[in-house]
Amino acid sequence: MKKKVGIISLGCPKNLVDSEIMLGLLKKNDFEITSDSEEANVIIVNTCGFIESAKEESINTILEMANYKNKNCEMLIVAGCLAQRYKDEIIKEMPEVDAVVGVSGYDEIAKVIEEFYSKKNDKNDKEKAVFHKDTLSVEYLNNERLLSTNSGYAYLKISEGCDNRCTYCAIPYIRGPYRSRKMEDIISEAEFLAGKGVKEVILVAQDVTVYGKDLYGQKKLVELVREVSGIEGIEWIRLLYTYPEEIDEELIKEIANNEKVVKYLDIPIQHASDKILKLMGRRSTSEGIRNILDRLRAEVPDIVLRTSLIVGFPGEDEKDFKILYDFVRKYEFDRLGVFTYSREEGTPAYDLKPQIKKSVKESRRNDIMQLQKEIVQRKNESRLEKVYKTLVEGVSEDGIFYYGRTYAEAPDIDGSVYFTSAEPLKFGEFVNVKVLNIDDYDLIGEVINESSK
């Protein structure tokens, strides 16, 4: 009898791509895929593990899935970043877990399951399967994926790892150095996605702006974008994530002039105080960040800018926080996320002093998020009565509205557009929506036949 396998994918879009690759490999090896954990014989939790809250979510999910061992679940696998970072602890402290698969072991997932079942009746073999290949290959990304995003968009991972050495971040230790995929492999995957009806391709990496530097000796993102934009069927190309110090004039011009590149950038800035940026090991300066933001706004009309910030980094005093707060107030980001600093063992910032009290970190986060809420309110009001090309993604739970996204919203992290239509709509298609109302971070509108922005 075919074994039913379910995957719970936690964390970032890059992790989702890895989950989709595992799904594709499992399907290829004749496993049955299920989204219902209750009926799964094998449950895989693809974990995130780079900050405390992500680790907690991963551990809680593993324990929750372990409860299904009282039902149909015969095998529980922990994969991904937490598995890579804490394999010994998982093996020792979580007896419910049957196998641990690190970030370089995704392409072995079918083998992991098959070996478990072949040894299941061997009373003498109690050892857990641990798959941690010491490889820097990105070839696993060339395996055919089983898409979990079924409404017109898909992520396309163009590299793995990171060469930045931010003092707070564990990702280079978990995922290894930056490794670009071959351009022809990425183009081939983009063509595959277009053939599946994908209209929006989201190029994703820890830092897309340095794509190609390690492989070709120079940055190749603009060339890659041009190649992808030539693929029939792809209408939107979105870039996640772009480091400010690597955004150059060539890239700005491409974003401004290429109609398929959505005018949206997610630029992780983290702070605006030069003192804190230096302590963080960031390559940017406050002046450099401001210059690139000014250039983007001047050269790319209607560009939507998202950023992420860290408050409560060791040594951040009231003066540093005021610099950050005033920076957010001045630059009025369209989208913004704020993390409180997470003290991660094995990172240089772990031993920095003084560490900031949790209550102070939370207070600073709340202050910036309140400011951002006011900024978003004003920006959303400016979108009233305008018409936007919108990707239809689904129907609301009450069945009254369709929902989707304009160029100004990335999946999962930004708001949505809720809208009515006189005619039935297909998911994964584009319509023109006139914005009539706002609801906090979301927009409300109706489908019309006018041309869109």
Swiss-Prot record:
One of its GO terms (molecular function) is protein methylthiotransferase activity. It is an enzyme of class 2 (transferase). Its main location: cytoplasm. Its EC number is 2.8.4.4. This is Ribosomal protein uS12 methylthiotransferase RimO. Residues 381-449 form the TRAM domain. [4Fe-4S] cluster 2 binds at residues 162, 166, 169. [4Fe-4S] cluster 1 binds at residues 12, 48, 81. It is found in: Cytoplasm. InterPro entries: Elp3/MiaA/NifB-like_rSAM, Methylthiotransferase, Methylthiotransferase_CS, Methylthiotransferase_N, Methylthiotransferase_N_sf, NA-bd_OB-fold, Ribosomal_uS12_MeSTrfase_RimO, rSAM. Residues 3-118 form the MTTase N-terminal domain. The keyword ATP-binding does not apply. Catalyzes the methylthiolation of an aspartic acid residue of ribosomal protein uS12. One of its GO terms (cellular component) is cytosol. SUPFAM superfamilies: Radical SAM enzymes. Keywords: 4Fe-4S, Cytoplasm, Iron, Iron-sulfur, Metal-binding, S-adenosyl-L-methionine, Transferase. PANTHER family: RIBOSOMAL PROTEIN S12 METHYLTHIOTRANSFERASE RIMO (PTHR43837), RIBOSOMAL PROTEIN US12 METHYLTHIOTRANSFERASE RIMO (PTHR43837:SF1). The gene is rimO. Belongs to the methylthiotransferase family. RimO subfamily. It catalyses: L-aspartate(89)-[ribosomal protein uS12]-hydrogen + (sulfur carrier)-SH + AH2 + 2 S-adenosyl-L-methionine = 3-methylsulfanyl-L-aspartate(89)-[ribosomal protein uS12]-hydrogen + (sulfur carrier)-H + 5'-deoxyadenosine + L-methionine + A + S-adenosyl-L-homocysteine + 2 H(+). Residues 148-378 form the Radical SAM core domain. It comes from the Bacteria. Pfam families: Radical_SAM (PF04055), TRAM_2 (PF18693), UPF0004 (PF00919). Binds 2 [4Fe-4S] clusters. One cluster is coordinated with 3 cysteines and an exchangeable S-adenosyl-L-methionine.
